[in-house]
Design a protein with these regions (language model features):
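Ser/Thr/Pro/Gly-rich, low-complexity intrinsically disordered stalk/linker tracts of secreted
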Residues: 25-261
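Bacterial N-terminal signal peptides
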Residues: 11-21
Length: 261
């Protein structure tokens, strides 16, 4: 091999190493936070959740590929009026949010990502919308629409399915996370942080009353009627592109007892 060829090979190897999202032998750690707003037994609520991903080796975490969020038992999904309309995935892909009715929106969020060749501070995807999708096998389906701009330009649609739970968990939102390219045909970005809500907070729906369009706020899922000792448990399983996985847990504290009048 000529000196020029060796130099090119070494340069290519260095570039590949610089673009790797995590160092060899390192693993991902996740911190999970959840909330009920309001946190009152039996009340309509907005469920908030967020997570932060880091790499034990100090580099970027491996791209996230799957998330299973396990929700506390006793949450009432029957009385909610979230998702009175259905958003069709094909319309969402083709037309974006304009392709779906306002009454299909069920939550909001944002994400912080980093490109493999970035400086580590992260770039925000400020708009992630959660919408009610067509049910699958009788299960609730949540569509997520992420609208990324510079430097990560991407409009991505992916979905989660609410599966029945067991034990202390009443359901599991199973979501496959698509890889987000950093540039066209480039390596995927790493997700550093996600914040999201499912519930009526900041949502406005519309209905027709006597021929007039009237705005109203939908009813969210309900906080369980009783709180187990230690609080409402949440757990999440995270899967990554490098084949590793990890589990994060947290609790929402039990609400204070109601004051007797």
């Amino acid at each position: 091999m000529s000196l020029l060829s060796k130099t090119r090979a070494v340069t290519a190897a260095l570039l590949i190493c610089c673009c790797l999202p995590a160092t060899a032998g390192a693993a991902q750690t996740v911190v999970l936070h959840t909330s009920f707003s309001p946190n009152k037994l039996g009340a309509s609520t907005t469920v908030g959740f967020s997570f932060t991903i880091a790499n034990t080796g100090g580099g970027l975490p491996s791209p996230l590929t799957g998330l299973s969020l396990h929700l506390p038992a006793g949450i009432d999904y029957v009385t909610t009026t979230l998702g009175l309309s259905i958003c069709q995935p094909a319309e969402l892909v083709e037309r974006g949010l304009t392709g779906c009715p306002p009454n299909s929106r069920i939550g909001y969020g944002s994400a912080l990502v980093e490109v493999p060749f970035g400086q580590g501070s992260g770039h925000e995807i400020p708009n992630i919308e959660a919408l009610m999708g067509p049910p699958h096998n009788g299960n609730i389906v949540v569509l997520f629409y992420a609208n990324g701009q510079e430097p990560v330009y991407a409009q991505i649609v992916f979905q989660g399915e609410l599966l029945p739970g067991s034990g202390s968990f009443g359901g599991s939102l199973e979501t496959a996370i698509p890889l987000i390219p950093s540039v066209t045909n480039g390596p995927p970005v790493s997700i550093l942080k996600v914040e999201s809500t499912i519930g009526p907070s900041h949502l406005t729906y519309y209905k027709h009353v006597h021929g007039k369009k009237v705005a109203f706020h939908p009813r969210g899922v309900s906080v369980p009627l009783s709180c187990p000792r230690g609080g409402f448990p949440f757990s999440a399983n995270f899967s990554f592109l490098d084949g590793t996985s990890t589990v994060a847990t947290t609790v929402v504290p039990c609400p204070p007892p109601s004051r007797r009048r």
